[in-house]
């Protein structure tokens, strides 16, 4: 069984990769701490929406990761760590809101409920919010890097929804006169020269 998605990790962010076959990933929240190479991936997360989404996408695309250490200083207002714990424990509601999150904007918009469910099943979160001691963090990474088995399903690659392409409207009428030379097509929202219509 393939355990790591091609081009892992699929989403860019403020992280470094270490041993892709390690069982532990490290999220340092708003702290920037020196990475230890025995973690699969190591980085910060300051927001309760896009930051949490990136963590989920990068974790579920590597079935080797079974633990996520949440450490470092919590980001004010956004509460990325609290939101990560909440989404793991409670999931999201029908509107994409992280159930139980106290973050400022706790909405997941770019990944599916299935991706969240997979994250909940695949990993155990190690809640050490506030821990900034490099030696203690290194010890946790060493304790968990080989612990347990690979998640028994292929990695999942989540594609972000396609952005709506901007369309260019051609004015068909000048129903609002701005001046002798300029008119506006109020349906298209375009101002153009009166002589061009």
UniProtKB/Swiss-Prot annotation:
The EC category is transferase
Q: Which InterPro entries match?
A: MeTrfase_MtrA/MtxA
Instruction: List GO molecular-function terms, semicolon-separated.
Output: methyltransferase activity
The protein's UniProt keywords, in alphabetical order, are:
Methyltransferase, Transferase
Q: Which GO terms describe its biological process?
A: methylation
The protein's superkingdom reads Archaea
Q: Which residues form the signal peptide?
A: none
State the family named in the UniProt similarity comment for this chain.
Belongs to the MtrA family.
How is this protein named in the record?
Answer: Putative methyltransferase Mtx subunit A
Organism this protein belongs to: Methanosarcina acetivorans (strain ATCC 35395 / DSM 2834 / JCM 12185 / C2A)
